[in-house]
Amino acid sequence: MEDPYLRSFALFFALFNPFLMSIYLLDLIRGLPTQVFSRVLVRGSLISATVFILFAWGGEAFFRDYLQVRFASFQIFGGIIFLLIGLRYVFSGAHAITAMRDNPSAMAGSVAMPIMIGPGTVSASVVIGTRLPLPGAAAVIFGTLALTVVILVVMKVLHDRLKQRH
């Protein structure tokens, strides 16, 4: 696997892991109609893509020059944030994300930020930005997000069909 585009796609797709993401989105899969669920995912993906492309473009210099922190510090802080989100899931259950929003436009932001945009995916976008020219990095980011959305919507449709049968 020497192609930098394929390696970048594999890295980003492995971090997104739509099968694991479906567990985080289970309350939305169960509670929203397919059309609303799809709209929320697309909006969340567009928010995420914008953030990832900015980090692919700015890279580590953004952390060093503008935020004045080392990139490793960001990753540690991101891990702490995920620990807190995980604890909220443990104590609140699948309704932890539902409590953060009440309408579909707010859902897109809450799907993007704690689920899609995290220290691992931001780190991956920085790596992709160093491997590829910006248009190529943007194509990989959009392609990976599009595939993730398609897989999640297909899983939602399958869930709804199985739910109707049983």
Name every feature range the model reports, one short phrase each.
Residues 1-15, 92-112:
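Small-residue-enriched transmembrane helix starts and helix-helix packing motifs
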Residues 2-10, 64-75, 130-143:
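Interfacial loop-to-helix junctions that mark the boundaries of transmembrane helices
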Residues 4-54:
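Juxtamembrane transmembrane-helix termini in multi-pass membrane transport proteins
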Residues 22-28, 147-164:
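Transmembrane alpha-helical segments of integral membrane proteins
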Residues 27-39, 103, 128-136, 160-165:
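Juxtamembrane helix-boundary/capping and inter-helix hinge elements in multi-pass membrane proteins
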Residues 38-89:
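Membrane helix-loop-helix hairpins that form the core translocation module of multi-pass transporters
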Residues 40-49, 132-148:
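Entry/N-cap segments of selected transmembrane alpha helices
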Residues 46-53, 82, 105-122:
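Small-residue-rich segments of transmembrane alpha-helices in multi-pass membrane proteins
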